[in-house]
Amino acid sequence: MDNQHLRPIRSFVIRGGRMTASQQKAFDRLWPEKGLAVENGLLDLESVFGRRSTVVLEIGFGMGQSLAEMAASEPDADFIGVEVHKPGVGALLRNMEEQSLENIRIFWDDANEVIDKCLPDASLDRVQLFFPDPWHKKRHNKRRIVQLEFVQRIRAKLKSGGVFHMATDWEPYAEHMMEIMSEAPGMENISGAGQFSPRPDTRPVTKFEKRGERLGHGVWDLMFRRVD
């Protein structure tokens, strides 16, 4: 079979749902300035943000509450958010407008496309992947975004000493992440071999997570740094 006709395995599904009126208005007003496009190719991060600063990539920011909170609490850092679901993009833009946040830019696209086509090598201080789809069924495990090949592509975009921070509330996925990350060349567990990390202050606790904690559900953080 001709390889060009093989469809890539996607780690996400496009959910339904329309933007609310307020999300759409925020999208219409802010997207021309705050939105980024894969087709424009490799980013000049200093030009994008108008300064040279710490740069953080968040993959799959959902409705964007946590990303907005992080950007507000780290005004000296610049954040690039990637999300495929338009209502989430609209919600984050509305948050950015309400809070006058200038240190976030957004891709409404597949993170794999963004990583491969838009991010310079050794340009990121931190990559965040919080609560990705766990793909519970065994036959769907191959759809999990955390795979060895993906980690190597993330590593290439991290600066030396840069951190890949993951979090999940699904223990089998946490174990899968640990197995993959422990095998990944050039990545070192900040908390020690085989150890999960305590939640750092840089990751806000979500309402969903607080509810889960009350019900006795666990959350697992993994933090690995690039070593050369």
Curated annotation (Swiss-Prot):
Pfam families: Methyltransf_4. GO terms for cellular component: tRNA methyltransferase complex. It comes from the Bacteria. The active site is at D133. Pathway: tRNA modification; N(7)-methylguanine-tRNA biosynthesis. One of its GO terms (molecular function) is tRNA (guanine(46)-N7)-methyltransferase activity. It catalyses: guanosine(46) in tRNA + S-adenosyl-L-methionine = N(7)-methylguanosine(46) in tRNA + S-adenosyl-L-homocysteine. Residues 139-144 are annotated as: Interaction with RNA. S-adenosyl-L-methionine binds at E58, E83, D110, D133. Substrate binds at K137, D169, T206, K207, F208, E209. Keywords: Methyltransferase, S-adenosyl-L-methionine, Transferase, tRNA processing. Its EC number is 2.1.1.33. InterPro entries: SAM-dependent_MTases_sf, tRNA_(Gua-N-7)_MeTrfase_Trmb, tRNA_methyltr_TrmB_bact. Belongs to the class I-like SAM-binding methyltransferase superfamily. TrmB family. PANTHER family: 3-DEOXY-D-MANNO-OCTULOSONIC-ACID TRANSFERASE/TRNA GUANINE-N 7 - -METHYLTRANSFERASE, PENTACOTRIPEPTIDE-REPEAT REGION OF PRORP DOMAIN-CONTAINING PROTEIN. Catalyzes the formation of N(7)-methylguanine at position 46 (m7G46) in tRNA. HAMAP family: tRNA_methyltr_TrmB (MF_01057). This is tRNA (guanine-N(7)-)-methyltransferase. It comes from Hahella chejuensis (strain KCTC 2396).
